[in-house]
Amino acid sequence: MIVVGTELAEAYFAKHAGHKGIRAARLQYESWLAIARRAEWRLPEDVKASHPKASILKSGRVVFNIKGNDYRLIAVVQYKGGVLMIRFFGTHADYDKVNAETI
């Protein structure tokens, strides 16, 4: 997949560099990013095959758990074009404050 919007996660990591657990979160994010870039997801089921705990939303967005359930990443996946757009990255508490269907 072509992944766009990585600057959202990078900005989050830069802003929270000293926080407990952020290094582990960054490593897990980088692992997720490597998988996403190699992926050829053509259907939501393809996402679920590689990320069984991902949530496929009605809006077509996908919510990925990063570092267990400590962090969330919301992405829009354009299956036909092979593009994944990161729309949100933050803690689970941050995630609870946004509308994942519209962000």
Residue ranges and their predicted role:
Residues 1-70, 78-83, 92-103:
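Basic, Lys/Arg-enriched alpha-helical interface segments
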